């Protein structure tokens, strides 16, 4: 079952609790190792790293900080960078992401990364995003399909919440 199928299978109620998104992510990430979570955070942080603005920062925080474990990894990563000025190796990140076999997690990551580069509007980040996913075996058409199907589900969820 893909990420968008997982979303659409959730019980639809007129009012979703605020913690539902964090719980959904926590459930999705439950079987991932710390190394895999670190690779996910690194990918999203790399895409969001172009010159900061409030909208981009908010998008990155929404994607990375709703899960407590991800927040801890992100804080450790920032602290490490401040102390050492070293960044994780891109090839190591790609290799680690390649060990994630859960389709729901991969589709979540595609959608989050794509959302960041859309807000970012940075040509280099866009190129990096598509290059990384190509190395992971995803063609642009597959990315486009995941994004469109996930957006449709998010729009449906917004309509349900606003009833």
Region roles according to the model:
Residues 2-48, 55-163:
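Small-residue-enriched hydrophobic alpha-helices in membranes
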């Amino acid at each position: 079952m893909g990420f968008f199928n997982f979303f659409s299978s959730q019980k639809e109620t007129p009012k979703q609790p605020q913690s539902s998104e964090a719980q959904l992510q926590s459930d999705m990430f439950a079987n991932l190792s710390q190394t895999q979570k670190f690779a996910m955070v690194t990918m999203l942080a790399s895409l969001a790293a172009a010159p900061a603005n409030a909208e981009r920062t908010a998008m990155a925080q929404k994607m990375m900080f709703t899960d407590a474990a991800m927040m801890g990894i992100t804080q450790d990563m920032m602290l490490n960078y401040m102390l050492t000025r070293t960044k994780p190796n891109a090839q190591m990140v790609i290799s680690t992401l390649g060990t994630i076999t859960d389709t729901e997690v991969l589709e979540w990551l595609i959608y989050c990364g794509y959302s960041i580069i859309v807000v970012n509007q940075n040509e280099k980040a866009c190129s990096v995003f598509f290059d990384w996913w190509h190395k992971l075996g995803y063609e642009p058409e597959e990315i486009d399909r995941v994004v469109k199907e996930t957006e449709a589900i998010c729009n449906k969820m917004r309509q349900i919440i606003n009833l």
